[in-house]
Regions:
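Solvent-exposed soluble domains appended to multi-pass membrane proteins
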Residues: 1-227
């Protein structure tokens, strides 16, 4: 299934995923509760709660691609009915773009915790592989407040530090039976499939990516910059 808290006409999602023969295309107008809206999307919490309800009715095994967007660019949480769900104090960055970004990330973390709790309540968690990743960077590379914040943390922020911070994107996997596995090297979203297949002892077939755990050196080119 594919789930997203926006309407299907945006990016032509309804037609795209139906043409890909996805069994269940769940968009904003297919969810029963649309009472909490953040920047035109269902709030992450509302999306996750209702997503688990739908997952509970699927025949196993299944795969679902869920797109949450409350921490998307814009970083405006005005639509939240309960602002206490944002627990971070951003201090002097309050009401700045950077401060809003931190608050959005904090709320996204809270909502994802709700998702995990709901999976456990539905007896889905123990047998579920969960992959979490961002689709692209958040802030502009040279956001002034972000650079100031990084400087206060580290004291000396170089242009290389700024660029590395800019291209880093959150990614993580939770696989039942596997723990304490950390990868500290540049990888791509294309590498998720072969890595997951390797960890689950499955044949990955043809893939553009490579197993993240393979001991293979390579050069990562990001927009003509060598990392």
């Amino acid at each position: 299934s594919y789930m997203h808290g926006n309407y299907g006409y945006f990016w032509n999602r309804t037609n795209v995923y139906n043409n890909m023969e996805v069994d269940h295309v769940e968009l904003k107008d297919t969810f029963a509760d649309t009472s909490e809206d953040v920047m035109g999307y269902l709030s992450d919490e509302l999306l996750y709660r209702q997503a688990v309800e739908k997952l509970s009715n699927y025949d196993a095994p299944f795969i679902s691609y869920i797109v949450a967007a409350s921490s998307h660019t814009g970083f405006t949480l005005d639509g939240l009915q309960d602002r206490s769900k944002v627990s971070i104090d951003v201090g002097k960055y309050k009401d700045t773009f950077f401060g809003n970004y931190l608050e959005s990330a904090n709320y996204a973390d809270y909502a994802f915790g709700i998702f995990i709790d709901e999976l456990k309540k539905a007896d889905l968690y123990d047998d579920t592989v969960i992959i979490l990743y961002g689709d692209h960077n958040g802030l502009d590379m040279y956001n002034n407040e972000m650079i100031e914040f990084l400087s206060e943390l580290d004291g000396n922020v170089t242009d290389v530090d700024i660029k590395l911070n800019y291209i880093r994107v959150l990614a993580g996997m939770r696989i039942p039976g596997i723990s304490n596995l950390r990868i500290d090297k540049p990888v791509s979203k294309l590498d998720i499939k072969p890595t997951l297949a390797y960890l689950c002892n499955l044949d990955s077939g043809v893939s553009l990516g490579t197993n993240m755990l393979a001991k293979k050196n390579f050069i990562c080119l990001n927009n003509e910059r060598i990392v």
